[in-house]
């Protein structure tokens, strides 16, 4: 019987390594796919590990710039903070992973793709809805969700099948990381009353360990895209990585969040997003300088919906594509420089400038240079307040009657 091919999203961890053996038992040839999203892993080692465990082919693809420009950039421009806190670190990477799974599956003639998600997380939804959107004819296999083993049973299976067991298996934490940040759950973090231990963090320093002197960074934007730090041009991925180091040193971007998952439960997550939080803050300030009031007041409505769509795994939905078009239109004049102070866990905007600035000092000033037409205020107030005045007159008559 000829074996079918399956493309597996491979991380190098225990779950996806065991999944290779498990899929072999189901008569599949496994093609492993590992993406470099900027998490800092030794991906060459991961690629070789997949082959040693039993994959017939192993891909390692650097997608850092694609992730930065096609995914993180939109999140920054839409100021996506789920429930006001979470910058969608993992949620942003899942549609890109799904896209590459489908591309490799079609290239290799595979009939199925597989992922290592459990049956109680958001990621299974994000992967599978994205895959259905891109190629509804591919079978999707979720080994971890199907086998329902305990951790002990999984380790026993790994030992029986000569699957290498990671040396960090005793770590209580479940970690996911990419350019946009780092998420951490499980272990003591499952108690929402417990303070996160310092070893739960990696990208940021504790406040007591941060410098006692602030650091200033000037971020340059072109049509809504961050392009420079302190006058030096970077690719977007490199800019994000550089800013992660700068802001992380000052403790910026630590987030402790009890969030409402798509699957109906609450979970406690600890995030580190130094660059994401700094860029979102700076970008919002530049928009405040360059957007007319109507756009500035309406855009948050769109931002909220975009955030929900991405969190819920609907990156490739028609509505998200339509809202993205609106978002892109709003970025045309978001060009300028923002000065940010990094200090003791805060990214504080202290200055902003733009050739498209709608701030007119001659209209705003209260000095002798004031050019605002004060006399025009009388007629404006009369017309603006007319509906309220008429309503009050009508209702007062009824009360008097």
UniProtKB/Swiss-Prot annotation:
<keyword id="KW-0067">ATP-binding</keyword>
<dbReference type="InterPro" id="IPR024074">
    <property type="entry name" value="AS_cat/multimer_dom_body"/>
</dbReference>
<protein>
    <recommendedName>
        <fullName>Argininosuccinate synthase</fullName>
        <ecNumber>6.3.4.5</ecNumber>
    </recommendedName>
</protein>
<dbReference type="Pfam" id="PF00764">
    <property type="entry name" value="Arginosuc_synth"/>
</dbReference>
<dbReference type="GO" id="GO:0005524">
    <property type="term" value="F:ATP binding"/>
</dbReference>
<feature type="binding site">
    <location>
        <position position="118"/>
    </location>
    <ligand>
        <name>L-aspartate</name>
    </ligand>
</feature>
<feature type="binding site">
    <location>
        <position position="259"/>
    </location>
    <ligand>
        <name>L-citrulline</name>
    </ligand>
</feature>
<dbReference type="InterPro" id="IPR014729">
    <property type="entry name" value="Rossmann-like_a/b/a_fold"/>
</dbReference>
<comment type="similarity">
    <text>Belongs to the argininosuccinate synthase family. Type 1 subfamily.</text>
</comment>
<feature type="binding site">
    <location>
        <position position="126"/>
    </location>
    <ligand>
        <name>L-citrulline</name>
    </ligand>
</feature>
<comment type="subunit">
    <text>Homotetramer.</text>
</comment>
<feature type="binding site">
    <location>
        <begin position="9"/>
        <end position="17"/>
    </location>
    <ligand>
        <name>ATP</name>
    </ligand>
</feature>
<feature type="binding site">
    <location>
        <position position="123"/>
    </location>
    <ligand>
        <name>L-aspartate</name>
    </ligand>
</feature>
<feature type="binding site">
    <location>
        <position position="271"/>
    </location>
    <ligand>
        <name>L-citrulline</name>
    </ligand>
</feature>
<keyword id="KW-0963">Cytoplasm</keyword>
<keyword id="KW-0436">Ligase</keyword>
<comment type="pathway">
    <text>Amino-acid biosynthesis; L-arginine biosynthesis; L-arginine from L-ornithine and carbamoyl phosphate: step 2/3.</text>
</comment>
<feature type="binding site">
    <location>
        <position position="174"/>
    </location>
    <ligand>
        <name>L-citrulline</name>
    </ligand>
</feature>
<feature type="binding site">
    <location>
        <position position="122"/>
    </location>
    <ligand>
        <name>L-citrulline</name>
    </ligand>
</feature>
<dbReference type="GO" id="GO:0005737">
    <property type="term" value="C:cytoplasm"/>
</dbReference>
<dbReference type="InterPro" id="IPR048267">
    <property type="entry name" value="Arginosuc_syn_N"/>
</dbReference>
<feature type="binding site">
    <location>
        <position position="86"/>
    </location>
    <ligand>
        <name>L-citrulline</name>
    </ligand>
</feature>
<keyword id="KW-0547">Nucleotide-binding</keyword>
<dbReference type="InterPro" id="IPR048268">
    <property type="entry name" value="Arginosuc_syn_C"/>
</dbReference>
<feature type="binding site">
    <location>
        <position position="122"/>
    </location>
    <ligand>
        <name>L-aspartate</name>
    </ligand>
</feature>
<dbReference type="InterPro" id="IPR018223">
    <property type="entry name" value="Arginosuc_synth_CS"/>
</dbReference>
<dbReference type="InterPro" id="IPR001518">
    <property type="entry name" value="Arginosuc_synth"/>
</dbReference>
<feature type="binding site">
    <location>
        <position position="116"/>
    </location>
    <ligand>
        <name>ATP</name>
    </ligand>
</feature>
<dbReference type="InterPro" id="IPR023434">
    <property type="entry name" value="Arginosuc_synth_type_1_subfam"/>
</dbReference>
<dbReference type="GO" id="GO:0000053">
    <property type="term" value="P:argininosuccinate metabolic process"/>
</dbReference>
<keyword id="KW-0055">Arginine biosynthesis</keyword>
<dbReference type="GO" id="GO:0000050">
    <property type="term" value="P:urea cycle"/>
</dbReference>
<dbReference type="Pfam" id="PF20979">
    <property type="entry name" value="Arginosuc_syn_C"/>
</dbReference>
<dbReference type="GO" id="GO:0004055">
    <property type="term" value="F:argininosuccinate synthase activity"/>
</dbReference>
<keyword id="KW-0028">Amino-acid biosynthesis</keyword>
<feature type="binding site">
    <location>
        <position position="183"/>
    </location>
    <ligand>
        <name>L-citrulline</name>
    </ligand>
</feature>
<dbReference type="GO" id="GO:0006526">
    <property type="term" value="P:L-arginine biosynthetic process"/>
</dbReference>
């Amino acid at each position: 019987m000829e074996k079918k091919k399956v493309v597996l999203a491979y991380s190098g961890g225990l779950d996806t390594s065991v999944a290779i053996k498990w899929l072999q038992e189901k008569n599949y040839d496994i093609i492993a796919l590992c993406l470099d999203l900027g998490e800092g892993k030794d991906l060459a080692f991961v690629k070789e590990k997949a082959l040693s465990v039993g994959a017939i082919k192993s891909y390692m693809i650097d997608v850092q710039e694609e992730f930065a420009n096609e995914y993180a950039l939109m999140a920054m421009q839409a100021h996506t903070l789920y429930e006001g806190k979470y910058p969608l670190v993992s949620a942003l990477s899942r549609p890109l992973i799904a896209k590459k799974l489908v591309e490799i599956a079609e290239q290799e003639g595979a009939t199925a793709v597989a992922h290592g998600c459990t049956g109680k997380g958001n990621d299974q939804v994000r992967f599978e809805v994205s895959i259905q959107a891109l190629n509804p004819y591919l079978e999707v296999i979720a080994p971890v969700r199907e086998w329902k083993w305990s951790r002990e049973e999984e380790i026993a299976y790994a030992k029986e099948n000569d699957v290498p067991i990671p040396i960090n298996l005793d770590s209580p934490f479940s970690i996911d990381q990419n350019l946009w940040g780092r998420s951490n759950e499980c272990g003591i973090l499952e108690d929402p009353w417990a303070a996160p231990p310092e070893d739960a963090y990696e990208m940021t320093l504790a406040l007591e360990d941060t410098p006692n002197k602030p650091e200033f960074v000037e971020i340059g934007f072109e049509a809504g895209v961050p392009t420079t730090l302190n006058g030096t041009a970077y690719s977007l991925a490199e800019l994000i990585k550089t800013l992660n180091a700068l802001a992380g040193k000052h403790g910026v971007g630590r987030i402790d969040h009890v969030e409402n998952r798509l699957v109906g439960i609450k979970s406690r997550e600890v995030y580190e997003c130094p660059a994401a939080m700094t860029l979102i803050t700076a970008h919002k300030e530049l928009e405040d300088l360059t957007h007319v009031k109507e756009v500035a007041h309406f855009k948050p409505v769109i931002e909220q919906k975009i955030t929900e769509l991405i969190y819920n795994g609907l990156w490739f939905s028609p509505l998200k594509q339509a809202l993205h078009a609106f978002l892109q239109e709003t970025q045309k004049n978001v060009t300028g420089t923002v000065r940010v102070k990094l200090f003791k866990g805060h990214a504080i905007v202290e200055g902003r400038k733009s050739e498209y600035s709608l701030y007119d000092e001659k209209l705003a000033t209260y000095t002798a240079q004031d050019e605002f037409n004060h006399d025009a205020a009388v007629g404006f107030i009369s017309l603006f307040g007319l509906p309220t005045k008429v309503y009050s007159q009508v209702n007062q008559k009824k009360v008097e009657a």
